[in-house]
């Protein structure tokens, strides 16, 4: 049985690619045709890729792999946070800061700073500071929550990065590849499938398409972790 049906993908607009002049020729094997100057993605191929991605992700979760969801564009931001939280993954949904992976020791220190500030705020310690100092600390807290809030539970580097919009998140791709971190990537017709281990050809601009794909991947992670827990109980 297919993880996602053709009708679900059609309704989500997953088949709409970019304008033909913006395509990457490496995506040709996933393109069905061109219509009115826009490439149409072959959803039969997408369904097959999604089946593979589901199994791969489920098995990775079952073996204890750690996941990071990345998608900072406006139409993906809320979905990335929602689905990452649902499956217990870390996430980046506002802005990719250089060195988030390759300079992990520094990033980890900033995350600890965020946790310290949150403890200070909840305990009332910030409120007890002079007004100007409290304002500075709260601005720092707000900034760290915005950019690093989704990483608070990530104690080590992830094993897998789940990506929305390969081109926009090119720095995340470069850092992951430099560290041999696996990439599960939604690929629109302007992307390069050679830059990821697990390709999912689909529209990465439509909210419903992003919701559909990330939702299924989150399901796979939850299913894999349940299987891992069941094995430990035996």
Swiss-Prot record:
Record's keyword terms, sorted: Ribonucleoprotein, Ribosomal protein
A GO term from the CC aspect: cytosolic small ribosomal subunit
Domain of life according to the entry: Bacteria
Entry-linked InterPro entries: Ribosomal_uS2, Ribosomal_uS2_bac/mit/plastid, Ribosomal_uS2_CS, Ribosomal_uS2_flav_dom_sf
GO MF term (any one): structural constituent of ribosome
Pfam families xref list: Ribosomal_S2
GO BP term (any one): translation
CDD domains from the UniProt entry: RPS2 (cd01425)
NCBIfam families for the chain: rpsB_bact
PANTHER family: 30S RIBOSOMAL PROTEIN S2 PROKARYOTIC AND ORGANELLAR (PTHR12534), SMALL RIBOSOMAL SUBUNIT PROTEIN US2M (PTHR12534:SF0)
Similarity annotation: Belongs to the universal ribosomal protein uS2 family.
Name the record gives this protein: Small ribosomal subunit protein uS2
The species this protein was found in: Prochlorococcus marinus (strain MIT 9515)
Name of encoding gene: rpsB
